[in-house]
């Protein structure tokens, strides 16, 4: 036990040697003591190490081609969107590595690199959210998804825009430095378009008001974020986060924007010679390739908001072939997922080609895109997933077109039949 003095009644810190009279607090442990000054020093060392570990580090920043190839493993089709996103993300994080918007040397004549956020257009269920999620997974950065429809101006019922940043901080385990290099995907942004092209004299708290509130965080600012939500806990301490290096990807279906584009480029949208598009017509989404900022202005987005989204790309409607590829090709394809589920019960699951075609046709018919494929698969496989765990005699289940369309029971192959069929094949191959 560390003691000083003739009487041995004064205790001292086991680390720095100061007596209990020289420090504010001395904390006892099993045979040792530590003072408040040493505790503060330890905290400073830990904080420095944590801040260094939370900095964005890559041995080498992935090149646009590498990013594209990674996206290709998870997202089917949408080549133009993947190419645009690959270049935009590479340039963004190259800028972050170079030192941010000012780079620390802007005053010495260095070129200032501005941030370029991304606007992603296209119908629902075509991969907008998946593209953003896959990018964040590859780069190993914090990722948050926000729904623009829940946002309102400060002071009105709904979520404040600062809650978007809170989700990102939570995704980074409250490591603010790490969150400052994350990606935020704001979905359904078309729902915050103002109600008319012309500015209104009445207050639009969930439309134009939200666009105005988003301007600063999109551009880059130091925002004050309430860690528990600002409205329920008004007296809490705020977290300061700099959004200069946060990449914002803003997405929406923008239903009706195709007609605005067509009227500008000269295609008739009214009358006997009008170009008619159904909800699932591929041309209705392909026309987004001709978009101009003035089209978004007519749709109801304010000029300042459009100006902070300089990169515009779009995803197109998925046809039957693309949906079949989504079912089978990606690393986490639905067919592979369900095959794995059945393997855990010792059963092989097979889909015929016409069954996959029928599932794709159902998704097109429902207008849900790739997002609706899982719901259809659950409906098709419900009865067999109910029976299989209780049956030990089944080796294989075969899903045919009739199972999908007519809801008949799938073909179940018993284990003895499967073994007898497997035997001759093995003898032949041997």
UniProtKB/Swiss-Prot annotation:
Pfam families: AAA_2, ClpB_D2-small, zf-C4_ClpX
Signal peptide (residue range): none
Positions bound to Zn(2+): 13, 16, 35, 38
Keyword Manganese on entry: no
InterPro entries, A to Z: AAA+_ATPase, ATP-dep_Clp_protease_ClpX, ATPase_AAA_core, Clp_ATPase_C, Clp_protease_ATP-bd_su_ClpX, ClpX_bact, P-loop_NTPase, Znf_CppX_C4
Function comment: ATP-dependent specificity component of the Clp protease. It directs the protease to specific substrates. Can perform chaperone functions in the absence of ClpP.
Stored PANTHER family: ATP-DEPENDENT CLP PROTEASE ATP-BINDING SUBUNIT CLPX-LIKE, MITOCHONDRIAL (PTHR48102:SF7), ATP-DEPENDENT CLP PROTEASE ATP-BINDING SUBUNIT CLPX-LIKE, MITOCHONDRIAL-RELATED (PTHR48102)
Protein name (record): ATP-dependent Clp protease ATP-binding subunit ClpX
Organism the protein comes from: Parafrankia sp. (strain EAN1pec)
Encoding gene, per UniProt annotation: clpX
């Amino acid at each position: 036990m560390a003691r000083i003095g003739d009487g041995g009644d004064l205790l001292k810190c086991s680390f720095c040697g100061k007596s209990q009279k020289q420090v504010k607090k001395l904390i006892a442990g099993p045979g040792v003591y530590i003072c408040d000054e040493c505790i503060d020093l330890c905290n400073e060392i830990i904080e420095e190490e944590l801040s260094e570990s939370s900095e964005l580090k890559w041995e080498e920043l992935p090149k646009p081609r590498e990013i594209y190839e990674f996206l290709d493993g998870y997202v089917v089709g949408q080549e133009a969107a993947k190419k645009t996103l690959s270049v935009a993300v590479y340039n963004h994080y190259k800028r972050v590595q170079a030192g941010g918007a000012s780079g620390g040397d802007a005053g010495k004549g260095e070129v200032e690199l501005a941030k370029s956020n991304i606007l992603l257009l296209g119908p629902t269920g075509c991969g907008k959210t998946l593209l953003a999620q896959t990018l964040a997974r590859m780069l190993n950065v914090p990722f948050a998804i926000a729904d623009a429809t829940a946002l309102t101006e400060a002071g009105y019922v709904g979520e404040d825009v600062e809650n978007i940043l809170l989700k990102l901080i939570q995704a980074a385990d409250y490591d603010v430095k790490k969150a400052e290099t994350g990606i935020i995907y704001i979905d359904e942004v078309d729902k915050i378009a103002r109600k008319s092209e012309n500015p209104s004299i009445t207050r639009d708290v969930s439309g134009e008001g939200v666009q105005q509130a988003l301007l600063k965080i999109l551009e880059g600012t130091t925002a004050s974020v309430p860690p528990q939500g600002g409205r329920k806990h008004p007296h809490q301490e705020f977290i300061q986060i700099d959004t200069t290096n946060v990449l914002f990807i803003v997405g929406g279906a923008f239903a009706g924007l195709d007609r605005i584009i067509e009227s500008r480029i000269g295609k008739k949208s009214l009358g006997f010679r009008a170009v008619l598009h159904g909800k699932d017509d591929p041309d209705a989404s392909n026309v987004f390739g001709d978009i101009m900022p003035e089209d978004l202005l007519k749709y109801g987005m304010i000029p300042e908001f459009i100006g902070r989204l300089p990169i515009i790309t779009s995803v197109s409607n998925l046809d039957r072939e693309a949906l079949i590829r989504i079912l089978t090709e990606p690393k986490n394809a639905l067919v592979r997922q369900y095959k794995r589920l059945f393997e855990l019960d010792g059963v092989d699951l097979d889909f015929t080609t016409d069954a996959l075609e029928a599932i794709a046709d159902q998704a097109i018919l429902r207008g849900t895109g790739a997002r609706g494929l899982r719901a259809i698969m659950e409906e098709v496989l419900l009865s067999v997933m109910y029976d299989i765990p209780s049956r030990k005699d089944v080796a294989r289940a075969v899903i045919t077109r009739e199972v999908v369309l007519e809801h008949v029971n799938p073909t179940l192959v018993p284990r003895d039949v499967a073994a007898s069929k497997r035997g001759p094949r093995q003898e032949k191959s041997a």
